């Protein structure tokens, strides 16, 4: 790793795996002493022709703090500046890692309850991979963990579900497809509104017994958050306790 006075480090790609046609799992070397908490994100930058400075984007960390590498999920955005270049990297090539880990998508912020629900779309699965793997390693989470992933096609759903189960064999995982026939079909907000999701999982989501974390497509996450707000499940704010944490990304 190379470091300079601007607190930027060059990190090399070690592995690349295709999760779906447009979602890639990238594994980079981890700088010594670069610490993070499960649920946080890092800023990755790539060189852009004609630009004096690298272009940076925030990506949630998918590895657990105990691992010696940094793992990310990158969804390729058509016309995007950064994601296509990240997805095109090959082992040995690298990116710029800027600063320290950041973010407040931390389970400890919403204590209590008996069930922890994770809702993710696409690359929004990344922070939950980190959290679930850390929990499996440390046995620090006593609440039941349920992960719900949403994607367009059955193939995409299967890729996300397989990745999640590989990181946490004990977590209950459910996948929902929006554009193809599936045992759980429809957008996450609709599946919540109709009660189909809770019926399928065999669990009710309540303010008293449940804690909820959301990460993924901003439009979907906004709708899911509004649904939970109507049920009294809200984020902690100004010292008031809450049951919900949210992070939107593409």
Predicted regions and their residues:
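Ferredoxin-reductase
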Residues: 2-91
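FNR/FR-type flavoprotein reductase catalytic core
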Residues: 4-5, 81-231, 239-242, 246-250
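A common structural junction motif
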Residues: 46, 231-236
